[in-house]
Amino acid sequence: MTLTIDTANDGLAMVLKDYQEVALYYLWRIDGKGASSRDVWMQVNDDLAGKRTISRASIINFLNSMVDEGVLNYTEITGKGGHRRIYSAKYNEAEFKEYVAKVVLKNLLRDFPDETRKVLSEVK
């Protein structure tokens, strides 16, 4: 997952779409128990009821991209219908925010090293 920053938004909404934020909060809330994509999809649509509906494919794509990024863990179980992934958060909310800050700063230091160091030294 490539982080895209929208500074017009606040908090996690700077880097996540609304349904993605809801999905992560759900996984943080269940605290390591893990959830299938179906569980996450149902919870996201319950939480966003009246606003919009999110497709299960969008949830699966997001969860898999977060696994690829190293933000989520998964285990595979075999059940009715074949194999399915059970997703769990690798980081809690604070650790995820640190991860986002680290990724952003790493890229700023790579592309604008002098300017980034100067600005960081001025920030109090």
Residue ranges and their predicted role:
Residues 33-45:
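Short acidic, hydrophobic short linear motifs in intrinsically disordered regions
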Residues 67-77:
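A short, conserved structural fragment
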Residues 15, 32, 51-54, 69:
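Helix-turn-helix/winged-helix DNA-binding modules
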Residues 77-98:
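Short, cationic-aromatic polyanion-contact patches
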Residues 60-64:
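Short, hydrophobic-biased segments on the C-terminal half of alpha helices
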Residues 45-59:
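Short, positively charged loop/turn segments that connect secondary-structure elements
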Residues 94-124:
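Amphipathic alpha-helical dimerization/coiled-coil segments
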Residues 1-25, 30, 34, 92:
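Short alpha-helical segments that sit at the start of domains
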